[in-house]
Amino acid sequence: MKPSVILYKTLPDDLLQRLEEHFSVTQVKNLRPETVSQHAEAFAQAEGLLGSSEKVDAALLEKMPKLRATSTVSVGYDNFDVEALNARRVLLMHTPTVLTETVADTVMALVLSTARRVVEVAERVKAGEWTKSIGPDWFGTDVHHKTLGIVGMGRIGMALAQRAHFGFGMPILYNARRQHPQAEERFNARYCDLDTLLQEADFVCLILPLSEETHHLFGQAQFAKMKSSAIFINAGRGPVVDEQALIAALQNGEIHAAGLDVFEHEPLAKDSPLLSLPNVVALPHIGSATHETRYNMAACAVDNLIDALNGNVEKNCVNPQVK
């Protein structure tokens, strides 16, 4: 008999077929309590769980006593209670490699669109405001040869540094838990403490996962240390930034502008002050959102679940020690 799994995300037909070749699949819309109650027997029998964006906590795990592995269609896993998974010896698989280049493209797009005011001036053109030769009130700021500060030199940070160094001639500063010799050799990147990076960088790009250590890592004190001409980019996780402090820094002119793909609370509230600021480019968490990459992420997640339930945790496993 095939192992039973719960699928809480729509998959392309070929990937669903692949999943069904290995497992008995129950598809549900979400992991809300009412859904779990409606499919109580399927959840009780499931050995695997696959999807994205939903909260997986101790209360859900109580309903899934046979669960052995869960596979998320994402690199981030802050919506999972990892301690609860570890306590029950449930493997957590993720997709850390397939989205690197696409997310780096998005970060670079935020750098360019924020510096050159692309969204703002495009809207002015659509509104019929381009009636004569443009003046300084339409101008942006250069990107090439400006100093880029990267906070978090992981895979995405490295891909961003490659684009910035070779494509735009940007000097690279970076801050991370440890030095990255490859970044220093390939991109002439300079490791420095966070305060130095904030004081010297023209663009501060935050590419960090959310953890107890990084929650509200950026607040009033950090924005106060940045240049008034600096542009802040967040493409990691929203709660790494104290959003109220960011709003105040933008409103008070402590920093020049911000390009944001993530927010403390998502979706972003319609009445958020960020949406009324002309010096903010706000995206709906589209870092990896291309047809190609989202397909590859889903395919990776399917393969990860197959591997995990067959005892193979050599790659893409957050907690291999519980095997």
From Swiss-Prot:
Main enzyme class: oxidoreductase
Catalytic reaction annotation: glycolate + NADP(+) = glyoxylate + NADPH + H(+); (R)-glycerate + NAD(+) = 3-hydroxypyruvate + NADH + H(+); (R)-glycerate + NADP(+) = 3-hydroxypyruvate + NADPH + H(+)
Keywords tagged on the record: Cytoplasm, NAD, NADP, Oxidoreductase
Main location: cytoplasm
UniProt-listed Enzyme Commission number(s): 1.1.1.79, 1.1.1.81
Record-annotated active site: R237, E266, H285 (proton donor)
InterPro entries, A to Z: D-isomer_2-hydroxyacid_DH, D-isomer_2_OHA_DH_cat_dom, D-isomer_DH_CS, D-isomer_DH_NAD-bd, Glyo/OHPyrv_Rdtase_B, NAD(P)-bd_dom_sf
Gene3D superfamilies per UniProt: NAD(P)-binding Rossmann-like Domain
GO MF annotations in UniProt: glyoxylate reductase (NADPH) activity; hydroxypyruvate reductase (NADH) activity; hydroxypyruvate reductase (NADPH) activity; NAD binding
Subunit and partners: Homodimer.
Family indicated by similarity: Belongs to the D-isomer specific 2-hydroxyacid dehydrogenase family. GhrB subfamily.
Function: Catalyzes the NADPH-dependent reduction of glyoxylate and hydroxypyruvate into glycolate and glycerate, respectively.
Name of this protein: Glyoxylate/hydroxypyruvate reductase B
